């Protein structure tokens, strides 16, 4: 069953300006080590960061909190499964909120899609509760 849904659309130029103005202060505040390594190695660095930023916004909406109530930027991280499909890992406040949303006997499956078409980056997050024995 779907227990959370969120989406976000961001202007890549906004993220690019934040990177130019604040540099590592911005990237270290908002992104995990894995996200920074992935984005810093990309030709379109700002677009890569913007997609991950949008994913975090979408995820916070799917959690029903936004970036409040103990949910912080680095509590949500975009990672890729072995086949390359993106998903999210939630820790700390975001992980606690996710656990509180799950019905007894269920585990979370987070679906994520991210895309960009300059000047925009977009993300959709669906949080699904799946039976542990099913």
Curated annotation (Swiss-Prot):
Keyword list (alphabetical) reads:
Cytoplasm, Fatty acid biosynthesis, Fatty acid metabolism, Lipid biosynthesis, Lipid metabolism, Magnesium, Metal-binding, Transferase
Q: Tell me which GO cellular component terms the UniProt record holds.
A: cytoplasm
Q: What is its EC number?
A: 2.7.8.7
User: Its Gene Ontology molecular function terms?
Assistant: holo-[acyl-carrier-protein] synthase activity; magnesium ion binding
Known cofactor(s): Mg(2+)
The entry's localization annotation reads: Cytoplasm
Q: Where would you say this protein principally sits, based on its record?
A: cytoplasm
Residues where Mg(2+) binds: 8, 57
Q: Does the keyword Signal apply?
A: no
Catalysed transformations (reactions): apo-[ACP] + CoA = holo-[ACP] + adenosine 3',5'-bisphosphate + H(+)
Biological processes per GO annotation: fatty acid biosynthetic process
Q: Which family does it belong to?
A: Belongs to the P-Pant transferase superfamily. AcpS family.
* Task of the protein: Transfers the 4'-phosphopantetheine moiety from coenzyme A to a Ser of acyl-carrier-protein.
Record-given protein name: Holo-[acyl-carrier-protein] synthase
User: Per UniProt, what is the name of the gene that codes for the protein in this document?
Assistant: acpS
